[in-house]
Amino acid sequence: MITNEALMVLENELTFSSEVERNYDDQFAVTGAKIGATLNVRKPGRFIGTTGPALNVEDFNETSVPVTLSTQFHVDTQFTSQDLALSLDMFSDRVLKPAVAAIANKIDFDGLTMAKNNTANIVGTAGTPPTGLITYLTAGAYLDSEGAPRDGRRSCIVEPFTGATIVDSLKGLFVPSDKISSQYTKGMMGRDSAGMNWKMDQNVVAQTFGSYATATLACATTTATGFISTGWASTSTIALTATTATAGLKQGDVITIAGVFAVNPQNRQAYGSNRLRNFVVTAPVTVATTGTTSVTVSPAVITGGQFQNVSLASTSASAVVTPFNNTGTVSPQNIVMHKNAFTLACADLELPDGVHFAGRASDKELGLSMRVVRQYTINNDSIPTRVDVLYGWAPLYPELACRVAA
């Protein structure tokens, strides 16, 4: 009963994690399973199509995203048999909720860190919270252009100060009275506003952008090192050069390359007014002023085939690389996303033998699993208890998300 109650508390405490795709697998609880096992989440194939009567068979290329269940997080506490005599509601409030809240915040924080480091599209101004709805609508436009459906599963996750800024900015505008009432009474954006569900999460992660304002970056799109002409990959390792000064790129920094335009995944045409494709740096690297430096970015630069995501209007031996920010600004990275952008996978942990109590609760619909293990200490009538979860995060369709810098 206590284990099931703990699982329900966890579901209620999750914020960011409640808005993403969640997967649960019970195969890892078998004897011999090891922490670090990997799930491969399949992604649907994509086709180009042919005009005219002639047959043109395309290969079926189904891709997958590995989700490594590498994080076992737990909260350890103890209570007495007298505590167990309390009603379940009292026990939940005094013991379970504080313990599970720590687990929920850890899961959310890890998820938001993963989202920040894997989301390339970005809007806003680093260091300044957005004051207009246009910033969030532009983020939504990126989702539209990348093929995200408007199916009621879009969400906007904001940190407290960003949320306070936008609510204050919109308080006098023409908004349905029920939305105004909700904003006034709760101090938050209405749940279903501007085409997305708004949620506040204090675990939104800040990006400290690299500081290299005096450096000029370039990429030789003529040689196109790391560019992929067909097929699929999640990242590309491209070659950058720096002049004037070295450039210390940080994980999570965003860059664009002149002449490399983003395309819609279905019609493969540049969207918007020929917007440049955003790329996120996946690992810290310093671009030297001599020679070229390999920089790994996401998404991969795919110029043709079924998974084409860029078009090259022209090439250059020194295409200008423009950073979103290069002044070392610290900026909370709020997230506008579709539910399928990221995935959280949970798995069962084995139940140990020789203990006072070992229980596990899991729910495939919720995509969650939790284990509670208790031992009895006869000397002082105490019951040491640990609550464990095993989970992993991965970007499923990171192009269906957009960071909102604040």
Which ranges hold each PLM region?
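Noncatalytic linker/hinge segments flanking ATPase motor cores
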Residues: 32-35, 42-45, 49, 82-84, ...
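Short, glycine/acidic-enriched capping/hinge loops at junctions between secondary-structure elements
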Residues: 50-55, 79, 397-398
